[in-house]
Regions:
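Bacterial N-terminal signal peptides
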Residues: 7-18
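Active-site phosphate/pyrophosphate-handling residues
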Residues: 98-101, 189-192, 213, 268-271
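Positively charged n-region of N-terminal signal peptides that target proteins for export
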Residues: 1-6
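Catalytic loop of the DD-peptidase/beta-lactamase superfamily, centered on the K-T-G motif
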Residues: 20-70, 199-204, 208-211, 216, ...
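Short secondary-structure junction motifs
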Residues: 53-55, 67-69, 109, 113-115, ...
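Secretory-pathway/luminal and periplasmic proteins that interact with or process carbohydrate-rich
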Residues: 66-69, 125-133, 142-150, 178, ...
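Active-site-proximal loop and beta-strand segments within enzyme catalytic domains
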Residues: 74-188, 195, 202-204, 229-252
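Active-site-flanking alpha-helical
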Residues: 103, 210, 219
Length: 463
């Protein structure tokens, strides 16, 4: 199961390409290099074969040393162009941390305050009497309707070049999901509006501002706003799966993802990006700490999302990460601060699971044991009470029965079998790091809770 919360801006031939020299890993928790690379190769090979997935590029670094950076499979299946560490992929929602950093740099200069109401910068935007502040957009607590959750109203126009006015018009009159600060729902509208705020404050187009203030100073030569029209060297083609075969992904105008998901990059550039964050070359230490420190909701409930970054852990190892999904691509970038380890996994196929690949690599790098997963028979009454549709923001989770087993399918994602662990708890069959717990009360479960990457996400039954 792919990450449930990167879905909105949602590989056959196996070919190993060593794309850059690998340095010697720093001694410590990282296991011996040659054996580690063999293990990583096996992990990615299995992911390619299970797909099909056209290509996966990965990079693993500890501190200033690259342990491995390479590509597997084909960046372009039709022309048999192999993937490498220099292959350029669309990032999807990994873009959000770039937008967050650009915004926080303006906070540091005093041009923006996190407590500013967004109408200070977007006076024509209707907040329907709600008080929406900048920090609400950064951590998905604004309650504004996400445009990628509008169904055909948005997706029917997603091939078209849409102006800011076009897109804002879709959401401006939609009821809020909740009052700002009282709930959490992953939201592309919030990050789109942040891009508009950046443009208003700087006077520059979003793409130009990031290029001049971030990409060029850091030497991120392969990172850019991923428009369809320009020639981008080493750019991967994007694919989808249809009946077990690869097909070209649906066309998406890159005007729509904008500051919520329109960047493209390579695994090597993303390693350098992470190093820049760690070394305070982008924002100072206090600002970065603010970005990775989740706030609480109005009722005191803690979040697991900072500003453009998810905060979690794996077997006690702190983890800062974000995934992305966009037409033809799935991606993830993870950093383990206690171990100074960065892992990047980029894939050019919808339905690929870079989150799981990343976690398997992390377990190998950090020398962690595989989690134990049972597959117990499910009592009939347990099946009956859990079947239904559950909503988490604009994401729908359909739970159904299939030959005595429970299957869950998230919006625009492939169905996955749930393995019963007992006591109303299940684990995703294709990602043991994702567990699902159904409420124990009542004849039918009124909600389910997803535990993923240190995050806790509650979905309410709607039918």
């Amino acid at each position: 199961m792919r990450s449930l919360f990167v879905h909105a801006f949602i590989s056959i031939c196996i070919l190993f390409i060593a794309a850059c020299p690998a340095g010697n890993p720093t001694p410590g928790t990282v296991t011996e290099a040659d054996a580690l690379v063999e293990t990583i190769d096996a992990i990615v090979m299995e992911a390619l074969e299970d797909g099909p997935t056209a290509a996966i590029s990965i990079a693993v670094a500890q501190g200033s040393e690259i342990i491995v950076a390479k590509g597997y499979g084909y960046a372009d299946v039709e022309n048999e162009v192999p993937a490498t560490a220099h292959t350029v992929y669309r990032l999807g929602s990994v873009t959000k941390q770039f937008t967050s950093v650009a915004l926080m740099r303006l906070v540091e200069t005093g041009e923006i305050s996190l407590d500013d109401e967004i109408t200070r910068f977007l006076p024509d935007y209707s907040t329907q009497g709600q008080t929406v502040r900048v920090h609400h957009l950064l951590n998905h607590t604004s309650g504004i309707k996400s445009y990628t959750g509008l169904g055909e109203e948005f997706w029917g126009k997603s091939r078209l070049d849409l102006s800011h006015d076009d897109l804002v018009e879709m959401i401006a009159d939609k009821p809020f999901d909740f009052a700002p600060g009282t709930g959490y729902a992953y939201n592309n509208s919030g990050y789109y509006l942040l891009g508009m705020i950046l443009e208003e404050v700087t006077g520059d187009p979003y793409a130009e501002h990031l290029s001049e203030t971030i990409f060029e100073p850091l030497g991120l030569e392969a990172t850019s706003y991923c428009r369809n029209e320009p020639i981008i060297m080493h750019r991967a083609a994007g694919y989808a799966r249809r009946e077990g075969e690869l097909v070209n992904a649906e066309i998406l105008s890159m005007t729509s993802p904008f500051s919520a998901g329109a960047l493209c990059s390579t695994v090597l550039d993303l390693v350098e990006w992470q190093r820049a964050l760690n070394s305070n070359r982008l924002v100072d230490a206090a600002t970065y700490e603010r970005m990775i420190t989740p706030e609480t909701l109005a009722d005191g409930a803690p979040l697991t999302y900072g500003y453009g970054l998810s905060i979690g852990e794996i077997e006690g190892h702190a983890k800062i990460s974000h995934g992305g999904g966009i037409n033809g691509f799935n991606t993830t970038l993870a950093y383990y601060p206690d171990d100074d380890v960065t892992i990047v996994v980029l894939a050019n196929t919808e339905g690929a699971n870079p989150d799981r690949v990343e976690r398997l690599i992390a377990r190998a790098v950090l020398d962690l044991p595989e989690p134990e997963v049972a597959d117990l028979p499910i009592p009939a009454e347990e099946i009956a009470r859990n079947v239904g549709t559950y909503a988490l923001g604009d994401l729908l989770l359909e739970v159904s029965e299939d030959d005595g087993r429970l299957v869950m399918q998230a919006t625009d994602q492939e169905a996955v079998r749930l393995l019963y662990q007992g006591d109303h708890r299940f684990i995703a069959s294709d990602d043991e790091e994702i567990s699902v717990v159904f409420a124990a009360e009542g004849e039918v479960a009124g909600q389910l809770t997803v535990f993923q990457g240190g995050g806790v996400y509650e979905a309410q039954r709607i039918e």
